[in-house]
């Protein structure tokens, strides 16, 4: 909660001079000029979403807290136990509201802060949650480090990324299951990389593996990779197949929680990206989607 207030204060200090523009003052004296500042554009986007009755989860949390403070005379005792999975996807403000509105409820909160792909809003460490929830003798924090998904080779590779993503606080302990080494290859051109990728996909399928993912940094890179690969190898619509078979080209944000027999990381620049904790978390999520094989390709 304190972190959220600090964020609001920082936002105010940065954007307070732009408030006349946000309120509708003409830009540079032109009454037809569109909103031009980042703050004004963000405000207009927010208004458009409200008109469509699309609400941000943090706005809903704030409104729930206001409603509780103004109208509710007693805490809500409807829920005895609340389970929360993928806890890293929500910021501490959400948990403050839940704890305030449901003071008598027991919580089981599960997640992996190393897989927080919403770096600016989600949980990047468990510390703030400790302060909010671990106040009684019965409250516990349990750290599960065993990785049953990946081979030792993939887990060790991901572990080196994790050193940056979590400052070394949370380490992987893989089960004993060996596989082939992680392959890293650099190419002169996107076309050369696409041709190599098509060959990899064919070899992976020959081994009897059913699912392969070509994981890209974002939707733009995924669209580019798809256009290069589609003339060279069959690709599957992931939504239509429920990820049960074939080769999918996907951005990182769509693969969290999924797993594939083999993963090809497409131009994610694993050598330089991990220096930034924000990027390291994305790379860690991408690398740990692989069950048996991980190939890292860059151009």
Question: Residue ranges of each PLM-predicted region?
Answer:
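Conserved helicase motor core of SF1/SF2 NTP-dependent helicases
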Residues: 43-44, 68-81, 88-299
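Conserved helicase NTPase catalytic core signature
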Residues: 1-81, 94-95
């Amino acid at each position: 909660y304190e972190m959220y207030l600090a964020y609001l204060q920082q936002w105010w200090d940065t954007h307070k001079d732009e408030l006349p523009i946000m309120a509708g003052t003409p830009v540079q004296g032109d009454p037809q000029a569109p909103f031009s500042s980042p703050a004004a554009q963000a405000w207009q986007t927010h208004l458009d979403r409200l008109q469509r009755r699309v609400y941000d989860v943090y706005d809903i949390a704030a409104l729930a807290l206001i409603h509780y403070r103004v109208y509710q005379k007693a805490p809500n005792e409807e829920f005895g136990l609340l389970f929360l999975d993928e806890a890293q996807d929500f910021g501490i403000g959400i948990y403050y509201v839940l704890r305030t509105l449901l003071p008598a409820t027991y919580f089981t909160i599960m997640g992996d802060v190393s897989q927080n792909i919403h770096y600016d809003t989600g949980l990047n460490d468990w510390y703030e949650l400790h302060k909010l929830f671990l106040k009684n003798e019965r409250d516990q924090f349990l750290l599960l480090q065993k990785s049953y998904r990946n081979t030792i080779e993939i887990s060790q590779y991901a572990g080196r990324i994790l050193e940056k993503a979590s400052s070394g606080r949370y380490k992987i302990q893989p089960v004993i299951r060996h596989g082939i080494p992680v392959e890293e290859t650099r190419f002169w051109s996107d076309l050369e990389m696409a041709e190599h990728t098509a060959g990899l996909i064919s070899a992976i399928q020959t081994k009897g593996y059913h699912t392969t993912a070509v994981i890209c940094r974002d939707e733009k890179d995924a669209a580019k990779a798809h256009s290069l690969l589609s003339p060279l190898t069959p690709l599957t619509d992931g939504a239509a197949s429920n990820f049960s078979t074939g080769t999918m080209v996907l951005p990182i944000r769509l693969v969290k929680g999924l797993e594939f027999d083999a993963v090809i990381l497409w131009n994610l620049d694993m050598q330089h990206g991990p220096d930034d904790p924000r990027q390291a978390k994305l790379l860690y999520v991408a690398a740990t989607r692989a069950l048996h094989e991980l190939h890292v390709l860059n151009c």
